[in-house]
């Protein structure tokens, strides 16, 4: 199941990058995941009296909800600690750690070799990379759109100018088989900006590392993509499944035309 899903772009691992000191100050987060099996050798977390100061997170917008949850839980134990979460994009995570502007750098992709090298040059050791969760990336349309599924070559043909998956350009809904009001309407496409790990993951998995079309309306965050698609019945965009609302519909995805499509789910 996992290998099939990976082949159609859906699953990606999320990471939390930090310095060694940052890891120690946030270690109790494992106890928040009661439903997940925890290493029995992990010592029980003990509250440290008198802890104060600030914890700042800079990085993936896709992980904002998780970071806000974790920092709020941390503040329940430490009333004197201030927390701040900035979802600027995964590419901002490592520079913020290196510059001392953040304690944690959430990333919705693997750290790049040059990012790890820059960190090691600064501190003399590699960053601590903690796999935290699995995210599912989905392709969305307006909730009233009759389209139910789409193939990966079609996704590439809509979002990419280079179309490395071999399809012809798709610019109108009629090319996807829709009739009536949709047939001659252009597909308004929405996505993330280059600072986002979601942008890079979609580029790799959905576009075969091809180039995005200039017509993609780049949004600053996952929520903004969903809002844009939900407000335009001729729109299509990509975002994490955790940001899905009643205003949009996540399309079933097929590796190729004519092959079974897999329905994205947050279960």
What are the residue ranges of the model-derived segments?
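N-terminal amphipathic/basic-hydrophobic helices that include classical n-h-c signal peptides
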Residues: 1-4, 26, 33
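Bacterial N-terminal signal peptides that target proteins for export
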Residues: 2-19
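Intrinsically disordered, low-complexity segments enriched in small/polar residues
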Residues: 5, 19-20, 51, 256
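Residues at the start of alpha-helices and the adjacent loop-to-helix junctions
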Residues: 9-13, 26, 49, 85
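Bacterial N-terminal signal peptides
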Residues: 14-27, 31
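Flexible loop/hinge segments at secondary-structure junctions
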Residues: 33-267
